[in-house]
Amino acid sequence: MALLTAAARLFGAKNASCLVLAARHASASSTNLKDILADLIPKEQARIKTFRQQHGNTVVGQITVDMMYGGMRGMKGLVYETSVLDPDEGIRFRGYSIPECQKMLPKAKGGEEPLPEGLFWLLVTGQIPTEEQVSWLSKEWAKRAALPSHVVTMLDNFPTNLHPMSQLSAAITALNSESNFARAYAEGIHRTKYWELIYEDCMDLIAKLPCVAAKIYRNLYREGSSIGAIDSKLDWSHNFTNMLGYTDAQFTELMRLYLTIHSDHEGGNVSAHTSHLVGSALSDPYLSFAAAMNGLAGPLHGLANQEVLVWLTQLQKEVGKDVSDEKLRDYIWNTLNSGRVVPGYGHAVLRKTDPRYTCQREFALKHLPHDPMFKLVAQLYKIVPNVLLEQGKAKNPWPNVDAHSGVLLQYYGMTEMNYYTVLFGVSRALGVLAQLIWSRALGFPLERPKSMSTDGLIKLVDSK
């Protein structure tokens, strides 16, 4: 969508709108995702070729010294098609906001939350899928879900003190033995065919991830009990919750929502950028996604919802479960004055309440309005932003997605906080692998930015 926005500005909103409409309605009747991609890719290749020919030398931004030392925050440096993060309204998946996705994407029979299959279809094609297309995708993933025996054996032999994310990354790496792309590349496949094999690998990997994740959960927390068999009549999330051992229909609905909203968050975050970077070396999707999961395992990326729960639990321990607004306000100030942050508040890009927080809050208001932990989260929502504004340091005093997700999981009995990032990883596959397909389809080259030393920067600045 960033490219579409640029197109609208640079060669006319009318033309760009026509391109969007063409993409969204091409081959809309087919239920085969690969067939639709085969139709869309040449059109997008031609569009980008024309765009680059006309505007390849156009300057899109400036780079400052602070950006280079500050984690490249705000630096426009890569093309990422599947989602765009707006500071004021949050994430848009191929142009659609989270409320729009909740309303427009197909749902399970009797369900109210969007199916992640529909979100993946949207990310890959730019089209809102039909129920038939989503059903096809559910069945396709069920058909591809079986794990090779060596991966099962490896998971069963991991020590119980090995972190779930380490197990996930290792298992994904070992699945590389199944890579269609790696085999075809070794045999000399033409680069115009790369995307077809990447597509097959991405579909296989997404299909197998719930089995890997459920196997890890059962081995660590359920005495190694069987995950059971995939049911081709059920959707991806329902099969996942069944394999985890959860039978509550509300928990399955929560998982559909969770897997949808955590799927993608633009291309600059650690996991998305890592998969993009590693994939640019023509590493297969298994290796690229395993690298992304190693980034997600870092405490500054994927562990935030655990930190929120730890902080909430400590808060309850110190001031009690039924705390007044005044005492809560004092506790928040004590947290800030001790040099710590309030976990779950603030975001590197967002400047308003994260819509992913809002939709989880709405889920809680509907299904668990009287839960003590949710009531505490709701109470914090009223108080924390005002305290942070008074302090004057936070650019964004509003809650993010992590302020809520752990509380919902706890309510339905998933109390194993070390496992939460695995759920995040299963979800994130939808976004980064959708983009990986397009990266190869569009022929994106090896990523190789120029680095500079401090001495080099000083000389550069002095010369200006």
UniProtKB/Swiss-Prot annotation:
Transit peptide: 1-27
A biological-process GO annotation: tricarboxylic acid cycle
Binding-site list for oxaloacetate: 356, 428, 448
Annotated effect of mutating residue 301 to G/R: Greatly reduces catalytic activity
Keyword Zinc assigned: no
Localization per record: Mitochondrion matrix
Post-translational modification: Methylated. Trimethylation at Lys-395 by CSKMT decreases citrate synthase activity. In response to mitochondrial stress, the precursor protein is ubiquitinated by the SIFI complex in the cytoplasm before mitochondrial import, leading to its degradation. Within the SIFI complex, UBR4 initiates ubiquitin chain that are further elongated or branched by KCMF1.
Ranges in a coiled coil: none
Purpose: Key enzyme of the Krebs tricarboxylic acid cycle which catalyzes the synthesis of citrate from acetyl coenzyme A and oxaloacetate.
Protein name: Citrate synthase, mitochondrial
High-level lineage: Eukaryota, Metazoa, Chordata, Craniata, Vertebrata
Gene name of this polypeptide: CS
